[in-house]
Amino acid sequence: MSDKTKNTKPVAELSVEQVKEALIEEGKKKGILTYAKIAARLAPFTLDSDQMDEYLEHVGEAGIEVSDDADDEDPDETELVKEETESFDLTDMSVPPGVKINDPVRMYLKEIGRVDLLTADEEIALAKRIEAGDIEAKGRLAEANLRLVVSIAKRYVGRGMLFLDLIQEGNMGLMKAVEKFDFNKGFKFSTYATWWIRQAITRAIADQARTIRIPVHMVETINKLIRVQRSLLQDLGRDPSPEEIGEEMDLPTEKVREILKIAQEPVSLETPIGEEDDSHLGDFIEDQDATSPSDHAAYELLKEQLEDVLDTLTDREENVLRLRFGLDDGRTRTLEEVGRVFGVTRERIRQIEAKALRKLRHPSRSKQLKDFLE
């Protein structure tokens, strides 16, 4: 490992502000940062969406472009040092519990389990051959690390993508690592490849797995919360509370609740309900904008009573009130507008309206509407 790498301060020892500042400095030098890099560097601090948005705005104000395209963005040494702490069981090619696969996939897992793993010296030898343009060496390096892809993909099962799709996305990340690996930096290929495989899988989950797209940085946060949740479930023998999760992650309970809410998958209104599947979820959800049956019935009765009362007025009085109060179309008119309709002055309309309202206030008519006004 290079001296420069040995002197790199571990991420865990840096404060969130130090990591943010380091990203800004790096962005100023390159002129660009990717969402993937920002998400990976800030993942240990579990920022919520508002905090991340605020920081991204700060990055933009510093004149740094933030890009979605992580294809050409290499991990820095701090990120690779973090990946070195990860360990995977490359001998276990079993299928995760609850995952159904077909025979071709089972055969694939069996075959890659037979491929010999590489020693550090063999990795370097292959890397040198790749540098010299040896295509066959690329294939050998990739083939020897297909187990690594499966091991990483297992950790993302249950996040909205099929196990096979996770493996395929991880394999794409592996091929990117093969293309870009520089053995002179002192890291093992598996360390370098782990970063690229993880990036490919998490980005695919963010882009494809959910009905509502979640930013990559929030996917990382959700993944961390799920790992903590599973660990606590094993320790406690029950589902942990948001308070317990927050204590483990060093997060306020409200932030945990927010993350859990974001992590929920939307449910289709077409989801069948009942044994016969003849009803759907949408049938049982109240339309807050719709008039309730009781209110609708009361409105229809009021309309009938109002029509009866208006029929006791002269045609002109009835029509003046209909226009003034918008009884037919919901649009009220001014005295002047009604006057133009009847070809009289606004003062004459006011007099007709006043006379009509006096008639309606008479007990013989008002008692018909009294119940609706209480």
Curated annotation (Swiss-Prot):
Protein function: Sigma factors are initiation factors that promote the attachment of RNA polymerase to specific initiation sites and are then released. This sigma factor is the primary sigma factor during exponential growth.
Region (Sigma-70 factor domain-3): 220-296
GO molecular function, one term: sigma factor activity
GO biological process: DNA-templated transcription initiation
Motif (Interaction with polymerase core subunit RpoC): 165-168
Keywords from the UniProt entry: Cytoplasm, DNA-binding, Sigma factor, Transcription, Transcription regulation
Region Sigma-70 factor domain-4, residue ranges: 309-362
PANTHER family listed in its UniProt record: RNA POLYMERASE SIGMA FACTOR RPO, RNA POLYMERASE SIGMA FACTOR RPOD
Family listed: Belongs to the sigma-70 factor family. RpoD/SigA subfamily.
Subunit structure: Interacts transiently with the RNA polymerase catalytic core.
Protein name: RNA polymerase sigma factor SigA
Chief location: cytoplasm
Statement: the UniProt record of this protein carries the keyword Hydrolase: no
